[in-house]
Amino acid sequence: MAKQTPLYDQHVACGARMVDFHGWMMPLHYGSQIDEHHFVRQDAGMFDVSHMTIVDLHGNRTREFLRYLLANDVAKLTQPGKALYTGMLNESGGVIDDLIVYFLSEDYFRLVVNSATRDKDLAWISQHAEPYQVEVTVRDDLALIAVQGPQAQQKVATLLTTEQQQAIAGMKPFFGIQTGDLFIATTGYTGEAGYEIALPKQQVVAFWQQLLAAGVKPAGLGARDTLRLEAGMNLYGQEMDEKTSPLAANMGWTVAWQPEDRQFIGRAALERQRMKGTEQLVGLIMTEKGVLRNELPVYFFDAAGNQHVGVITSGSFSPTLGFSIALARVPTGIGEHAVVQIRNREMPVRVTKPGFVRAGKAIVL
């Protein structure tokens, strides 16, 4: 039977259509996915992301452990609260998961990992933590709400104490701080400003209701997906998985090659892939009528006149732009134009970098 977050009854009360999402009953939408999408882009929306897993790591060798476990390098994290985005790879260079890691103190780091990969992530982390004597604590006592949009931070501030407001004042992106019972982080999955807030489960219903009263609109998985697609953000299981290299998933920037003597899981395989070359993740725009969908083939000719085929990993109508967009994995050599096969029609598409909207503004037109 699917699990419920502590906010399940609140979703039902708000008129949500609930669906099974990787073993969790989650809101798909609360009536209009499009309206929820626009509200996040233009004002402030909130998402229940309590199905995600928060993992605390304690021990004197935690930093050393994470420098081995993760493709990005936590040596970059020198200021308490600073976070980074990274892949956690297997020995063949495939992506076990993508996650955020926070440096809280020299013997205390926090990971936030995906719900769909929870069991395998925890097994992998625990297995590799043991030689480093790192204590792995799953924080199932916490709930998680993402509040996103241009008015998100302002509306959240109205619910905080003076001390909490001062604690987060001027906090840059990709930081997290514990203030009172709230862990407030300037992270998100929408391309908008906002916070992801972890708090004790027994307090989350009251906090949700306070956010509602402050004019923050609930948004479901549907809007979350179109928002992250517009922002060019990957979804695990679509843009990458255990058989996909981060180099083929627009995650090359998250691989810390320096220093050269840092050994991390998957490094040797990635170095071979880097030498040989991999496929690449690109953006697609289709202004003609129709919708780009996952798994549709993408055809193009390279400079030598040879035809190649790729595949759409995520595609949808873009509510912000008013036409269809997609992320696609394609062989190298693609130019600015390609064709997508939709039923019996070959539809022309424009090839862009993977990212279409940031801070409410189009970045591809």
UniProtKB/Swiss-Prot annotation:
InterPro entries attached to this UniProt entry: GCS_T, GCS_T_bac, GCST_C, GCV_T_N, GcvT/YgfZ/DmdA, GcvT/YgfZ_C, TrmE/GcvT_dom1
Keywords for this protein: Aminotransferase, Transferase
Disulfide bonds: none
Catalysed reactions listed for this entry: N(6)-[(R)-S(8)-aminomethyldihydrolipoyl]-L-lysyl-[protein] + (6S)-5,6,7,8-tetrahydrofolate = N(6)-[(R)-dihydrolipoyl]-L-lysyl-[protein] + (6R)-5,10-methylene-5,6,7,8-tetrahydrofolate + NH4(+)
GO cellular component annotations of the record: cytosol; glycine cleavage complex
Domain of life: Bacteria
Primary enzyme class: transferase
MF (Gene Ontology): aminomethyltransferase activity; transaminase activity
GO process annotations (BP): glycine decarboxylation via glycine cleavage system
Enzyme Commission designation: 2.1.2.10
Role, per record: The glycine cleavage system catalyzes the degradation of glycine.
Similarity section: Belongs to the GcvT family.
Subunit architecture: The glycine cleavage system is composed of four proteins: P, T, L and H.
UniProt protein name: Aminomethyltransferase
Organism: Yersinia pseudotuberculosis serotype O:3 (strain YPIII)
